[in-house]
Every structure is written in structure tokens, then in C-alpha cells.
Design a protein with these regions (language model features):
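Rossmann-like NAD(P) dinucleotide-binding subdomain of oxidoreductase/dehydrogenase enzymes
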Residues: 146-283, 408, 597, 628-665
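Glycine-rich loop-to-alpha-helix module at the N-terminal edge of alpha/beta enzyme cores
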Residues: 59-149, 539-628
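Residue-level signal for inorganic ion chemistry
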Residues: 58, 94, 116, 186, ...
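Conserved C-terminal structural/oligomerization subdomain of aldehyde/semialdehyde dehydrogenase
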Residues: 1, 59-62, 213, 237, ...
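Short loop-to-beta-strand entry elements in the cores of soluble alpha/beta enzymes
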Residues: 97, 180, 184-196, 200, ...
Length: 665
């Protein structure tokens, strides 16, 4: 197209980014990529390879080595042997290495960006302007965290060896999210990148060599899901961090249960995007374009559920459709393209199938009229309205450029619709009323809520989910604690208390007292209709306790879940109640000590010390109740990031036989 024609039509011209240097880097490796283990990039003999292709045209980029069990063992062993020295060198020395990585990422930023786009299919402007700068930011931030660890976190130490598995939607950024805090705190790492997108991780391995990272501190193993499964189950791993689907996260949790490994899961989402009638609609439309069509909607926190207040719904949908008409879809290496390629034909097939099946339940579909390229994996930006809140499209994560919309009447209804999901990763609230925003945001069950914005990420602000979106935080001070454990004096091993047996005949001690269950603020008899005897160390019957069954457990969990007023109560009130419990326990100190003696057979002094410790714990937790403050994070945006503490929810506790009262408190 000539300049004159461009000026007459005002159409976008092509602005292609060169892939020459990235392809030269691949050719330098003869098109075959190895593993990074113990400071060396290698391809062990006899290994299989799998292909990685450019999703925009289906052409082969490179062949990636499939790691074996022996390779995983070697990587974990290298990390284990390197960990004591890495932690022992101290935070300031580790900080220099992280700083070097940050500088090298900036020096090679264009190569990283181009390689990321070739491998993943996201537009080059997203890789260049968003992903890579944020990768460097994470290493800069965590270099500072390492520098200050001994002053600011002197009561913490590294966990050990971290096994990390990352997804294909943000390959290098997820690598930085995982590796930077882990090595900053003195851990060593074995990381597995996604099968579809391993190239930037292998380029990162090369800059680790350039930065002089000690052998074994960082290890990269490539392969399919079988490699990840073996890695997280490896007995040499102390900490597992995974970002990916909820289904795989659930399997990981089951696989490592009982192994004593620390775990962070950042899983799927179905994030709500709330637009109130007083919002700046034009800004909200632009924000929505970023929320759902950024990275082709392949974002765990994508604002894929749109809720607009009824009074402005028609206007907002019209503006949104007009904006969709202007979206450019095509070669992600074109700097003027808005929406790139889906990462793989399998993912494209999954998106198509979910949408077609979901539309059978109802809904009106509108697609961007932009012409799709003939080759590659592309899906048009899509809006589906007039769907039921319980339908599949509204409830299931599509992980593609598909937006599902509905309306609401009142703020209370908006909150109810937004929380009507099994996920809880993020949310966006659009309103010009700051009072409304500050009222709505804390009511949303999610890890992150953005006000008049979306997809705001920074290394200084923690990110993570609730419900089936996972647990744990990455980024900020919260993310540092995910890779440390407290330093404390060795605990004394408690002697095991054996169950006492004896005669079921009670002593003649007067009127019988029935020990019932305590559920929902009242004493209730067990649904089972059974009671179990409790004997003293001499074999005498102390009393009968109710034997709970499944229904009792269900009733107890339901009562605890419904007691939401406790979490919403003022911290001062919770503190006063805990103090009051401590006062009442103190008044009956001797009675509780006698019961402990009769049940465990311990000395009177030990029983009294246990009761005293329980009272002390109650007063300590009461003291902390109104002092557990949030934080204001310093993020490099025009705004402020507030970290607000929230209760975990309903907690199930199994008390030990040892120290029965203190264990309960």
C-alpha cells in the first residue's frame, strides 16, 4: 500500500517485526534444544524430542528434549548439593546475581520478546511492552529483597529445593514469578516450562551462564506432563509451585499430600468485570478489551464474565461491539495487530468446542468481523450475551477470546452474580463513586480486585487466588514468605499418649452428666446415637463422649460456614471475646488441670503449665486480633495497591492426644 492510499483510507499498514535474530539463535543450536542441569546445557544420549511450532503459521521452530527420570534425578541432586552454599553466601551476594539477571534480560529484551511471540503467538507489542519489562522488574525487585533479607526477615530461612511447573500463556513472565523469589530467599530451583513454550526458558538458561549463576542453583528440564508429574513427586523437592489448570492443581495436591512439601497453586479463573451505571463507559470498554482480549484471552485472571448495570447495558454493549469491529487480528509479529494466535491447535479446538456446546443452552453471539488468516490457530474476539448465570459458558473457564455477558440491577445483585462461581482469582470494578468501589471490592471473593483498571501486575504486589483458583501469593512481601520457613528452636518430641482402657462401670460419683457435641452455638446430641467411654490412666471411667458421624460433621461445617459475622466483626470485638475466654479459663484453671491429669496421667505441675500456656495463647491471639494490619504497596503505577487481610474461611482442626487443651487453643 502506497503512502497516498494510506492517507486516503486511513487504514493500518503492516509494521512487521524481524524474526531474523531469533531464528539465528535457534539455528545456532541446530534446531534442537537441550536441558540446563548443574550449570551446563546438554542433550543426554538417547533422549526423545518433541516439536514446538509457531502457532501463527504452524511452521516448525525447534525440537525440544524430553527429559527422562535420570535427568530429573540429576537436576534435583544438583539443586540439593548447591542449596547450602547458595543460602550460606548471604543475601547481599545473592542480590548481585539477581541484579545481573535483570540487566541481562534488558540487554537481550528484543530477542526475548521476539522469541516469546514466535513460540506463544501473542502480539509482539504485548511481549515487548508488557511481558519482558515486567520480567526484568521482578528480578530487580527480588534483588532488593535478597539484599534486605537478613535485616527485614532475620527470623526466616530458605525452604530448600523448589520444584516449579509453569504454563504456556506467559512463559518467561511465569518463570520470573517463580524463580526470582525462590533464589532471592536462598532456595535452589528445578523448573519445568510448558511443553508448548520452552524456548525463552532455554534462552534464559544461557543468560544464567552469562551472569555466572553458581552451578546447580537453577536447573531447567523440558518435557510433557509426565516430566512435571515426576518432578513434583520427587522426594528431593521441598517446595512445589504450580501455575496452570485447576484440574492439574487438584491432582498435584493429591499427589504430594502427606509428603511434607510446601505448596503454592495459582490456578484457573472466571473473573467478573462489573460496570456500574455511573462508570466512564468509554474507559470501561477499553479496559475490557485489555481484560479479555489481552493474550487472546489466554489469561487465568481474564475478565471473562461481564456484568453491566441494566440502565447502561444497551449503550455499553453497543460501544463494545463498535470497538470489537476495529480490532486487528493477524500475524502476531505485526506491531499493529491487537489479537494474535491461539497457542496450539488443541487449545483452539477446546475453545471452539466449549463455545458451540455452551450456545446450545442459549445466548446471543457477536463476533469481531475482522478477517482471520488462512494459516495458523486463530479465533475471533467473541461476545455472548443473554446467558443464564448457571450456564456452562458463564461457569466454565474457556481460556480464549470469549466474553460472556449479563446484567444486574443493584450493587447487592452484582456481588451475588460475581461470586456465583467456584473460582476466585481476580475482579474489576468500574464506577466513578469511590464509596461504592470501596464497598463492593472487599465483598468480592477473589484474590485481587482492580478499581477502574484491569491486569495491573507488579513485583511489589502479591497475586493469587481463592477457592478453586488456588492459594498462596506470588509477588510482594507475601510472595517472599512462600519460599521461607521460620527459624525456631528445635521442638521437643512429645511422648505418645496411649489410649486408656478400663471397666465401663462408672464410679458412684452422683448424677450422670452427658457430654454432648457443640455445634452452631449450642450443645447437641450426636446424630449417631452412640457414645464412647473415656478412661483415666488407672482404667476408671471418666465419662462418655458423643460419637459424631457424617451428618454431625456436615452440620458443624455448615454452621461454621454460615457464621460469617465473626469474620466481619470489628477486630476489637474479636479481641474482647478472646480475652473473655482467657479470663473464664483462668477462673477454672484447677478444674481443667485436674481433667488433664485424669486423662493423660501427667504430673500436676505439667497439667497446670498446660492450662497456663493455653491462657497465655488466648491473650496473645487477642492482642494480635486488632493489630494484624494490611499494607500499601509501592507499585510503579499512578495509583496505590492495598493489601487487605481476609480470613481464610472455615478451618478443620484435628487435635492431638498430647497436650489436649493447648492443642485445641
Amino acid at each position: 500500500m502506497k503512502v497516498k492510499e494510506i492517507l486516503e483510507t486511513m487504514d493500518y499498514g503492516n509494521a512487521p517485526e524481524s524474526s531474523e535474530q531469533a531464528m539465528d539463535w535457534i539455528k545456532k543450536h541446530s534446531g534442537e534444544m537441550g536441558l540446563y542441569i548443574n550449570g551446563s546445557i546438554l542433550i543426554p544420549d538417547g533422549r526423545e524430542f518433541f516439536e514446538t511450532k509457531n502457532p501463527a503459521n504452524g511452521k516448525l521452530l525447534a525440537k525440544i528434549c524430553q527429559a527422562s527420570s535420570e535427568d530429573i534425578d540429576a537436576a534435583v541432586l544438583a539443586a540439593r548439593q548447591a542449596q547450602p552454599h547458595w543460602e550460606g553466601m548471604g543475601g547481599p551476594k545473592r542480590a548481585k546475581y539477581l541484579y545481573a539477571l535483570a540487566r541481562l534480560i534488558q540487554k537481550h529484551s528484543r530477542l526475548f520478546a521476539v522469541l516469546e511471540t514466535l513460540d506463544n503467538g501473542k502480539p509482539i507489542r504485548e511481549s515487548r511492552d508488557i511481558d519482558i519489562p515486567l520480567v526484568a522488574r521482578h528480578f530487580y525487585y527480588h534483588a532488593g529483597a535478597a539484599q534486605l533479607m537478613e535485616q527485614e526477615m532475620s527470623d526466616q530461612r530458605a525452604i530448600g529445593v523448589a520444584g516449579q511447573v509453569i504454563p504456556w500463556n506467559f512463559p518467561l513472565l511465569m518463570l520470573a514469578w517463580k524463580i526470582a523469589p525462590a533464589i532471592a530467599m536462598g532456595n535452589t530451583v528445578v523448573l519445568k516450562p510448558a511443553e508448548f513454550t520452552s524456548l525463552t526458558a532455554l534462552l534464559f538458561a544461557e543468560i544464567c551462564l552469562e551472569a555466572g549463576i553458581p552451578n546447580g542453583v537453577l536447573n531447567l528440564i523440558t518435557g510433557d506432563g509426565r516430566v512435571g508429574e515426576k518432578l513434583i513427586s520427587h522426594e528431593g523437592i521441598d517446595k512445589v509451585a504450580f501455575t496452570g489448570s485447576t484440574a492439574v492443581g487438584r491432582k498435584i495436591r493429591e499427589a504430594i499430600a502427606g509428603q511434607g512439601k510446601e505448596l503454592t497453586l495459582e490456578l484457573g479463573g472466571k473473573s467478573p468485570y462489573l460496570v456500574f451505571d455511573d462508570a466512564d463507559l468509554d474507559s470501561a470498554v477499553e479496559g475490557l478489551v485489555d481484560a479479555i482480549w489481552f493474550n487472546q484471552g489466554q489469561v487465568c485472571c481474564a475478565g471473562s464474565r461481564l456484568f453491566v448495570q441494566e440502565g447502561v447495558a444497551d449503550t455499553f454493549h453497543r460501544k463494545l461491539m463498535e470497538r470489537m469491529n476495529k480490532l486487528r487480528i493477524g500475524d502476531p509479529m505485526d506491531k499493529s495487530v491487537d489479537v494474535g494466535a491461539i497457542v496450539d491447535p488443541k487449545q483452539l479446538e477446546s475453545i471452539t468446542q466449549i463455545v458451540e456446546d455452551g450456545l446450545k443452552e442459549g445466548g446471543i453471539r457477536y463476533r469481531s468481523p475482522a478477517e482471520l488468516p488462512d494459516n495458523g490457530s486463530f479465533y475471533p474476539p467473541t461476545l455472548i450475551t443473554e446467558v443464564d448465570p448457571a450456564c456452562r459458558l458463564m461457569q466454565e473457564e474457556i481460556f480464549g477470546p470469549v466474553l460472556v455477558g449479563s446484567t444486574f440491577r443493584t450493587p447487592a445483585e452484582a456481588v451475588a452474580l460475581a461470586n456465583n462461581t467456584r473460582y476466585g482469582l481476580a475482579a474489576s470494578v468500574w464506577t466513578e463513586n469511590i464509596n461504592l468501589a470501596l464497598d463492593i471490592a472487599p465483598k468480592l471473593i477473589c484474590g485481587v480486585a482492580w478499581i477502574n483498571s484491569t491486569n495491573q501486575f507488579d513485583a511489589a504486589a502479591g497475586f493469587g487466588g481463592r477457592r478453586e483458583s488456588g492459594f498462596g501469593r506470588e509477588g510482594g512481601r507475601e510472595g517472599l514468605y512462600a519460599y521461607t520457613r521460620p527459624i525456631h528452636a528445635p521442638s521437643k518430641k512429645l511422648e505418645k499418649v496411649e489410649a486408656h482402657t478400663g471397666s465401663p462401670e462408672p464410679d458412684n460419683q452422683g448424677i450422670d452428666r452427658t457430654s454432648t457435641l457443640f455445634i452452631g452455638g449450642k450443645q447437641t446430641r450426636p446424630d449417631s446415637g452412640y457414645s464412647n467411654p473415656v478412661f483415666s490412666t488407672e482404667g476408671k471411667l471418666i465419662g462418655q463422649v458423643g460419637q459424631g458421624n457424617r451428618k454431625d460433621i456436615r452440620n458443624a461445617v455448615e454452621a461454621a460456614t454460615n457464621a460469617q459475622g465473626w469474620g466481619k466483626a470489628f477486630a476489637h470485638l474479636r479481641a474482647q471475646i478472646l480475652y473473655y475466654l482467657g479470663e473464664n479459663l483462668s477462673a477454672r484453671k484447677n478444674e481443667f488441670a485436674d481433667r488433664i491429669i485424669s486423662m493423660t496421667g501427667c504430673e500436676k505441675k505439667i497439667a497446670q503449665e498446660e492450662v497456663t500456656a493455653a491462657i497465655d495463647r488466648l491473650f496473645t491471639y487477642a492482642a494480635w486480633a486488632d493489630k494484624y494490619d494490611g499494607a500499601a504497596h509501592g507499585v510503579p503505577i499512578r495509583g496505590i495497591a492495598l493489601a487487605m487481610n481476609e480470613p481464610v474461611g472455615t478451618i478443620g482442626v484435628i487435635c492431638p492426644d498430647e497436650s489436649p487443651l493447648l492443642g485445641l487453643i
